[in-house]
UniProtKB/Swiss-Prot annotation:
GO CC, any one term: plasma membrane
Membrane-related topology note: Multi-pass membrane protein
Phylogenetic classification of the source organism: Bacteria, Pseudomonadati, Pseudomonadota, Gammaproteobacteria, Alteromonadales
Protein name per Swiss-Prot or TrEMBL: Probable peptidoglycan glycosyltransferase FtsW
Organism name: Pseudoalteromonas atlantica (strain T6c / ATCC BAA-1087)
Pathway info: Cell wall biogenesis; peptidoglycan biosynthesis
């Protein structure tokens, strides 16, 4: 499935719907891809510089590890491109089978694995050597994301749903501790705790799990003598600088020599076989010595951007009602951030050494390929959300277009009938007004007639009164006067 297959329709949709849209619409998050490639490129340079002395001694070829790391980068990019073409629906439906595959790999390592430095962590398949814990981590996080989607209400409402994924984690932890690989167990435990908390687990369950996990890790450290030596050397490495604290003291000297801008590429002294595992677990010490505080800050900033993008994708996926994608993105972000913190903290003397690589930077084929595949998953999650959003825009645009066309295509008969109705109503109103005016005129005429009749009646009454007054003033006769006097 080619990228251009999706890019052309996406660009056409944006160009059609948005006049001010950019000319090129990218179907993938290019910034995330560039961040991952930048870390890989820096890792190739630092691995080449840090591994040259030991490669010259072991293989008589100073570029032995550099060539192998370059091949791993090519394979990692191929794995990321492959994952980018797999729909998220496949990961949702296949997470249980992936979990089973992870368990099979961990069991196979214990049965037919290869031991290096007292640890049985590698599984040889022909010329390829796989560290089974790396794919097992990714498969477990896929299963946990699917479980939280299927059992969300059960996880948030009762302890039974909260405890079920912990049983699966316990099975993984036992198999990993038999290798032994405590660092991977701690990373998986912290990622599980963080993901359950983000999924809405109750606080008392969250703190209970954190306390139980911390107590279990403490017990495991005290149970093994070599782990106790790591703790004591971490607390005071200078107490035994040529024994248990040797690796950490050499790492601290590398950090100290780096200063702000470092000694320059290739000018490290600690890589001259003073610092063991300089190109793997302690690659940040060599980077700090050669590139200084500025180089360390740059690498940490690149990783921080990847982690923030993963967490932002998780939040956006939840808003788009894609919970599986959200929980998987969250788990990748927590995984990357915690493993980075442990790697840098161990090399800087802040945390005990755990044997964890720096994501996308350290030498190691299994770690690099799985980390790149995880980045490919993030790109795929973002891609599907972009396609979903553009399809929504396209559907809304089509709905608006159909609405406007239906309005334009209304028949003229309907509009003429409407005009006739309006004119009829206006005529009725006019007739009603005329009738009202005529009625008012008739009322006024009747009032005027009544007023005129009243005026004429008043005139007649006044004339009658005047006539009666004039008759009362005439002289009466003597007989009347005598009668008046007699009376």
């Amino acid at each position: 499935m080619n990228t251009s297959t999706f890019a052309t329709p996406l660009r056409a949709m944006f160009a059609q719907r948005h006049d001010a849209a950019p000319a090129v619409v990218r179907p993938y998050d290019v910034s995330l891809i560039l961040l991952a490639l930048s870390l890989m490129a820096i890792g190739l340079v630092i691995v080449t510089s840090a591994s040259m002395p030991v490669a010259s001694r072991l293989f008589d070829n100073p570029f032995h590890f550099a060539i192998r790391h370059g091949i791993y980068i090519v394979l990692a990019i191929g794995a990321a491109l492959t994952v980018m073409q797999i729909p998220m629906q496949w990961w949702r439906t296949s997470n249980a089978w992936l979990l089973l595959l992870g368990l099979v790999l961990l069991i196979a390592v214990l049965l037919v694995g290869r031991s290096v430095n007292g640890s049985t962590r590698w599984l040889a398949i022909g010329p390829i050597t796989i560290q089974a814990a790396e794919p097992a981590k990714l498969f477990f996080f896929c299963y946990l994301a699917g479980y939280l989607v299927r059992r969300y209400e059960e996880v948030t409402e009762n302890i039974k749903g909260f405890a079920k994924p912990l049983v699966v984690f316990f099975a993984f932890a036992v198999l990993l501790l038999l290798q032994p690989d405590l660092g991977t167990v701690v990373v998986m435990l912290c990622t599980t705790i963080g993901l359950l908390f983000l999924a809405g687990a109750k606080l008392w369950q969250f703190f209970g799990l954190a306390f139980t996990g911390g107590a279990a890790v403490t017990f495991l450290i005290m149970f093994e003598e070599y782990r106790m030596k790591r703790i004591t050397s971490f607390l005071d490495p200078w107490a035994d600088p040529f024994g248990s604290g040797y690796q950490l003291t050499q790492s601290l000297m590398a950090y100290g020599r780096g200063d702000v801008f470092g000694q320059g590429l290739g000018n490290s002294l600690q890589k001259l076989e003073y610092l063991p595992e300089a190109h793997t677990d302690f690659i940040m010490a060599i980077l700090a010595e050669e590139l200084g505080f500025a180089g360390v800050l740059t690498v940490l900033a690149l990783m921080l951007c990847i982690v923030l993008k993963a967490m932002k994708m998780g939040s956006k996926a939840l808003q788009n009602e894609r919970p599986f994608d959200a929980y998987l993105a969250y788990s990748i972000g927590i995984w990357f951030s915690f493993q980075t913190a442990v790697n840098v903290g161990a090399s800087a003397g802040i945390l005990p050494t755990k044997g964890l690589t720096f994501p996308l930077l350290s030498y190691g084929g299994s770690s690099l390929i799985i980390m790149a595949a995880a980045v490919g998953l993030l790109v795929r999650i973002d891609f599907e959300m972009r396609v979903e959003g553009i399809q929504a825009i396209d559907r809304s645009g089509k709905a608006k277009a159909s609405t406007s066309s239906s309005r334009k295509n209304k028949p003229k008969t309907a509009s003429s009938a409407g005009k006739k109705k309006v004119s009829t109503v206006l005529d009725d109103v006019a007739y009603a007004v005329v009738d009202d005016v005529q009625d008012e005129e008739q009322d006024i005429d009747s009032i005027m007639d009544d007023f005129a009749q009243d005026e004429s009646a008043q005139t007649v009454s006044h004339q009658t009164k005047r006539a009666s007054k004039s008759t009362s003033k005439t002289p009466r006769g003597k007989d009347e006067e005598q009668e008046d006097g007699y009376v």
